[in-house]
Amino acid sequence: MLIGIVNLNRFGEPTHLIHSIEKLGHNTHVIGPSDHLTSIIKKSPINHWFFTGSSYDVLSPISPQIDLGLFELKDKHLFMICYSMESALYNLGYKLQKKPRTNRRLFDIVSPDGTRLRVWKSHDTYAPISMNPRLKPSSRYNDEIMTITYKNTIMTQWHPERTTDGIVFMRDWLEN
């Protein structure tokens, strides 16, 4: 299957994501941010799209943002990673908060059923559960929303392409 990637990275290709998708037996097509992104994805024969993380500050007016029209593309399946999740939630009107970035990258997150996943995260902006009571995360780390579903989209505040548990999570999403 051909998988689309919207590369929001400031510098370079999302090589970890590309390699992880290819290891799962799929080919990739990478595009950059565009003012016409929703139209491009709508017209594309590709049905599964990943949106990368980024080192941009999502709260900056010059940073690329997720277009809310993407959530109306019912025949497309979207997977937004880290920065992309922050941008989507911010543009949907949810509250974000800053925290100091840490050098620690591997964390265990917990789903409502108690399942633990080993994940890689590197963000300093996040959506606090306590400030967004309408959101129902499917996994969390302390007060941070780590995984959430909205319409046609799964969003992770972590990078699934960086751990075995994350790659399994990606595989399951692609197969369902």
What are the language-model segments listed below?
Residues 78, 89, 97-99:
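Residue-level detector of intrinsically disordered/flexible regions characterized by low predicted structural confidence
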Residues 22-80, 85, 92:
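Flexible gly/pro-rich beta->alpha loop and the following alpha-helix that scaffold active-site loops
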Residues 2-24, 34, 45, 97-176:
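Amide-donor transfer/coupling interface in amidating biosynthetic enzymes
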Residues 12-13, 89-91:
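Short amphipathic alpha-helical surface micro-motifs
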Residues 58, 87-90, 128-130, 164:
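Short catalytic/ligand-binding loop motif for oxyanion handling, primarily in non-cytosolic enzymes
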Residues 83, 87, 156-158:
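Long, contiguous hydrophobic alpha-helical segments, chiefly transmembrane helices and signal peptides
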